[in-house]
């Protein structure tokens, strides 16, 4: 029904031969039957998957897909490192806000006799092993259990905040926390979100610029907030010459995402010294 309403918004389709289906409806197309299941907000309001029992095939709409350009058709043919990264990139930049819906949908998927999952875009998952792998991976990503790994994202004007970022990384690694350092100038916000898949902590740094944070950092954190990451720890730091608001702004932005902020923000006037 929602899909039909959307079509009416785009097209003059009242005279088209459209059959509206809902969860549990079955369509016979000769040798095969298509059983429909609504999966609202995964990741569109009108999302629906289709199951063909004769082929043990789930046509999964956007779920289990990837934005990947390849000449291969099946997931098991592709380099697995690149494939797993593509799965994380797609999930953490598109599906992440709908993780509760994912967790509700997975038991429905697991109740079906499936030998192949064909998403709307990306590689096809074939065979029991491949199907189990992607379903388990989706559950892990949707649960967002904290991981003992951190990411430090930063912008810098005259390298003072950059020096602080390197010091934060060194301190974390000295206590055994693997850390990824990412400049928002060098890494697109979608790359930063993909890395967040592996990290339980986000530490953000920016110099003060016009009494607030740098524009690229503001853009990155606004994008991150919209994707609603859960179960993360946050931290903030920054350098300044005069007013020094950036670290406080970062702290408040991370806290507004629901991140646990166990320590106060850290700010440095002018340039950091080793003794600091």
Model segments located where?
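Terminal amphipathic helices with adjacent charged low-complexity linkers/tails
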Residues: 122-149
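Short, charged N-terminal beta->alpha structural module
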Residues: 153-175
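Short internal beta-strands
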Residues: 1-3
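Catalytic core of the metallo-beta-lactamase
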Residues: 11-77
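Conserved beta-strand elements of the Class I
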Residues: 51, 58, 149-153, 235
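Short hydrophobic segments within beta-strands
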Residues: 60, 120, 153-155, 182, ...
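FMN-binding flavodoxin-like domain, especially the glycine-rich phosphate-binding loop
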Residues: 70, 80-117, 122-124, 167-180, ...
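Active-site-proximal loop/helix segment associated with metal-binding centers of metalloenzymes
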Residues: 43, 63-96, 140-145
């Amino acid at each position: 029904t929602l899909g039909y309403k959307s079509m009416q918004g785009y097209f003059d389709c009242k005279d088209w031969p459209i059959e509206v289906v809902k969860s549990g409806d079955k369509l016979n197309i000769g040798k095969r039957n298509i059983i429909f299941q609504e999966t609202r907000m995964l990741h569109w309001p009108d999302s629906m998957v289709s199951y063909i029992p004769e082929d043990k095939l789930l046509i999964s709409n956007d779920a289990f897909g990837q934005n990947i350009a390849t000449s291969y058709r099946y997931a098991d043919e592709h380099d697995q490192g690149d494939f797993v990264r593509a799965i994380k990139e797609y999930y953490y930049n598109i599906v992440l806000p709908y993780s509760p819906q994912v967790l509700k949908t997975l038991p429905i998927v697991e109740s079906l006799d499936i030998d192949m999952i064909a998403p709307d875009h990306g590689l096809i998952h074939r065979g029991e092993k491949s199907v189990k792998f992607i379903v388990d991976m989706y559950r892990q990503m949707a649960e967002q259990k904290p991981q003992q790994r951190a990411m430090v994202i930063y912008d810098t004007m005259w390298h003072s905040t950059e020096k602080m970022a390197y010091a934060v990384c060194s301190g974390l690694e000295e206590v055994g926390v693997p850390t990824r350092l990412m400049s928002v100038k060098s890494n697109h916000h979608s790359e930063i979100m993909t890395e967040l898949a592996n990290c339980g902590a986000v530490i953000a740094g920016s110099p003060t610029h016009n009494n607030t944070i740098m524009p690229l950092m503001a853009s990155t954190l606004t994008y991150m907030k919209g994707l609603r990451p859960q179960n993360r720890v946050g931290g903030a730091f920054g350098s300044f010459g005069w007013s020094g608001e950036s670290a406080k702004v970062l702290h408040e932005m991370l806290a507004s995402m629901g991140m646990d902020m166990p320590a106060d923000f850290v700010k440095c006037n002018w340039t950091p010294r080793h003794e600091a």
